Amino acid sequence: MKIKNTLFSLITVTVMTIGTVNAIETIVIKGSDTLGAKMVPQIAEAFKAKMNKQGVEVAFEIAAEGSSTGVASVIDATAEIGMSSRDPKDKEVAKAKAKGVDMKAITMAKDGIAIIVNESNFIESISLEEIELIFSGDVTDWSGITAQTGEISAYTRNTSSGTYAVFQKLGMNSRDYGVDSQKMAGNEQIAAEVANNPNGIGYVGLAYIKTPGVKVLPVDGSMPEDPSYPIARPLYYLSDNSKQLSPLANDFIGFSMSPEGQNIVNRVNFLSIY
């Protein structure tokens, strides 16, 4: 009987040890579509491959639902890492503090918000003033800023998007969007609509400027990759600084900042932090 109990104990310890070795940790990341649709998933895949070579299995749950979701996910502790293409708002910071959350924003890349039109459009450049006129609804026909005619279809992000707020501030002088502007869920949807509409105009992150059927307009003579480009912003990881990140989540953020991670940032047409 003693032998059987000893054998059972050995088997139990062995099974528990194997279970510990093979346990897969899942890193939950939520927020900005600008970060979460292409860039962060590609960084995550590279990180997984690196960890696998070290015998560590890691999985990711990435939800690209807008910057507001990213901020809320850190406040509500539904994600270990948030993603945002804008600074947290004062009311969000206040809500975080009320819940004991010390919101930390880590710049992991930079992005220019590109103005795109259909490739058949004759317009070759645009000014900040003209952008404001179009997206505020003051100009609704191309004849208002060019020699061509046609009713303008202006495509924007939805209100939960950080890009929506940043563009409103930097591209529209903080004016309200026009009532006829069409709100889209993500960059990909805006690019697709503009590609299919000869009178379309919209704004997207740099990862989407090579969408077939669209072209990028210089703004006041500068392209989105230029240091002088007027509609540019940092892209953030968010975390709760009052809590210690899991070792793997911390390593993932470090990997994102490493030369290998920043090479991926550049590869998907965003701008590295150095």
Where are the language model's segments positioned?
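Bacterial N-terminal signal peptides
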Residues: 9-17
